[in-house]
């Protein structure tokens, strides 16, 4: 693995009917069903310029001979994807999964499809997202018993909360969970959670009149006026853990970060009416979102793992939303309810030893 020799004669170009300029992101694996090596390549139809994942096979990759097969997946009229980038394919239990990233539709991020066979047909789950818009180019790997997905959290240009999403950033890792119906969920890897073993106190900075605090439990009565409790900075690396309940179908509740003396903040909130977890910047523009169906008066577990400006929120070990929040580590954070009554209980803060 240290010394490589470039084979100058090796070249694969797009077959007839496909766009040669965007013909990239090869993913090679040994296909147990075919007893051959398979290679996925991201490209587009030509004409038409619609996203497609081509499939090539080879009995001997070193020979440079790859035979084109029927496409693994072509974007549907409902998808209408321009490009499906950084594709990955794997089997988990009885299902095959196809993962790809898409950055041009109104639902940007890392998506997946599932099937009973590598040849399909591929079905789209009700929620086909692995994470929101700030987790991209997800690729997977297994340690033999668990499977993880690795993606990057985009930086912004300029590098502040109002900057535009740029390319590349910090790596974030989720553990993939297979639900009983075959759909996928995400949770924080146990090895990551174990790093945060030093307990610290959540120091209250300020509370609005409609917040009740009692030994790590907080009731936010924000139906009429915004309810907000803020805490002092928890530093560069920390994990926030709590249980929360939403009292009604309308309104939002969640967390605020990078609160400053002017009263501005970024927020990640739970929106039952929209069926989403949503990240907003400091001028209340939506920047990322993840579908999640909430129910009133139901308790949910939430974990937030932060390092620098990266903030990753997990709910019930089932869903994740990754965010970029500049200035978080130097500033206050808190809990918020707007048009909503909510409770946060057993609030715990831990840091690495």
Predicted regions and their residues:
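Short loop/turn segments immediately following beta-strands, especially the blade-tip
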Residues: 1-4, 56-64, 113-121, 179-184
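Surface loop/turn signatures of beta-propeller and other carbohydrate-active proteins
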Residues: 1-30, 63-87, 121-139, 192-195
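Structural motif
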Residues: 48-55, 106-112, 158-163, 170-173
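Beta-propeller fold recognition
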Residues: 153-210
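Secretory/extracellular carbohydrate-interaction modules
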Residues: 219-278
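Short, aromatic/His-centered strand-loop micro-motif at the edge of beta-sheets
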Residues: 281-301
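Ligand-recognition surfaces built from glycine- and aromatic
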Residues: 325-353
């Amino acid at each position: 693995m240290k010394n490589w020799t470039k084979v100058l004669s090796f070249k694969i170009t797009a077959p007839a009917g496909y766009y040669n300029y965007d013909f990239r992101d090869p993913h090679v694996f040994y296909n147990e069903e075919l007893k051959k090596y398979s290679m996925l390549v991201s490209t587009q139809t030509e004409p038409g310029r619609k996203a497609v994942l081509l499939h090539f096979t080879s009995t001997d990759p070193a020979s440079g001979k790859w035979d084109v097969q029927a496409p693994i997946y072509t974007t549907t009229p409902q998808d209408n994807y321009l490009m499906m980038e950084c594709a990955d394919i794997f089997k988990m239990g009885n299902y095959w999964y196809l993962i790809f990233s898409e950055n041009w539709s109104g639902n940007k991020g890392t998506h997946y499809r599932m099937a009973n066979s590598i040849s399909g047909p591929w079905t789209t789950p009700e929620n086909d997202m692995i994470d929101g818009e700030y987790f991209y180019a997800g690729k997977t790997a297994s340690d033999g018993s668990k499977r993880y997905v690795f993606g990057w959290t985009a930086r912004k240009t300029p590098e502040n909360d109002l900057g535009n999403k740029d390319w590349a950033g910090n790596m974030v890792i989720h553990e993939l969970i297979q639900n009983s119906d075959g759909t996928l969920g995400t949770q924080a890897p146990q090895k990551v959670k174990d790093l945060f073993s030093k307990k610290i106190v959540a120091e209250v900075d300020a509370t609005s009149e409609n917040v009740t605090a009692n030994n790590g439990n907080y009731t936010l009565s924000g139906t009429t006026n915004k309810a907000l409790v803020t805490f002092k900075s928890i530093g560069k690396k920390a994990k926030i853990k709590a249980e929360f309940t939403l009292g009604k179908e309308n309104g939002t509740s969640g967390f605020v970060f990078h609160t400053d003396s002017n009263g501005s903040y970024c927020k990640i909130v739970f929106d039952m009416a929209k069926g989403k977890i949503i990240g907003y910047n400091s001028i209340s523009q939506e920047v990322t979102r993840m579908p999640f169906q909430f129910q009133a008066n139901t308790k949910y577990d939430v974990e937030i793992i932060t390092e620098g400006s990266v903030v990753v929120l997990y709910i019930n070990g089932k869903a994740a939303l990754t965010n970029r929040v500049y200035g978080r580590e130097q500033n206050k954070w808190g809990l918020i309810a707007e048009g909503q009554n909510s409770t946060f209980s057993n609030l715990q803060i831990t840091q690495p030893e």
